[in-house]
Amino acid sequence: MFLLWCKELIVINTNPKRSDEPVWWSLFGAGGTWFAMITPITVLVLGILAPLGVIDAEALSYERVSSFATSIIGALFIIGTLALPMWHAMHRVHHGMHDLKFHTGVAGKIACYGFATIISALAVVFIFMI
């Protein structure tokens, strides 16, 4: 009876084409979350409270900041602060170009995500140079 109602048989593709989009969306989401939750606090502490003298200058001395940057938590924090928002921004640029009818195809994808990869790699390299 169901086959009489449904005029076409639905064929399920058992070997679907895999997309790489979940990788980019996860980096986009992580970057957006980091930028929305961590970056404002970082700007508040380092850009407003420290210059106004609310935070003691000794707390941000070269020795303490260098010690923080060379610890695993500090290195991950700095890399996350530089790399994750860049992935978010480049994903927005890539899809924004598509929305504005700049269909760059694979070249645009490689350019955007390649730039984010370069910035991420430079963040890691600069952390190891400290």
Curated annotation (Swiss-Prot):
Gene Ontology annotations of biological process type: fumarate metabolic process
Localization of this protein: Cell inner membrane
TM stretches of this protein: 35-55, 67-87, 110-130
Domain of life: Bacteria
HAMAP family according to UniProt: Fumarate_red_D
Cellular component terms (Gene Ontology): fumarate reductase complex; plasma membrane
The protein's name: Fumarate reductase subunit D
Keywords on record: Cell inner membrane, Cell membrane, Membrane, Transmembrane, Transmembrane helix
Family: Belongs to the FrdD family.
Function: Anchors the catalytic components of the fumarate reductase complex to the cell membrane, binds quinones.
Quaternary organization: Part of an enzyme complex containing four subunits: a flavoprotein (FrdA), an iron-sulfur protein (FrdB), and two hydrophobic anchor proteins (FrdC and FrdD).
Cited Pfam families: Fumarate_red_D
SUPFAM superfamilies in the record: Fumarate reductase respiratory complex transmembrane subunits (SSF81343)
Annotated source species: Vibrio cholerae serotype O1 (strain ATCC 39315 / El Tor Inaba N16961)
Recorded topology in the membrane: Multi-pass membrane protein
GO MF terms held by the record: succinate dehydrogenase activity
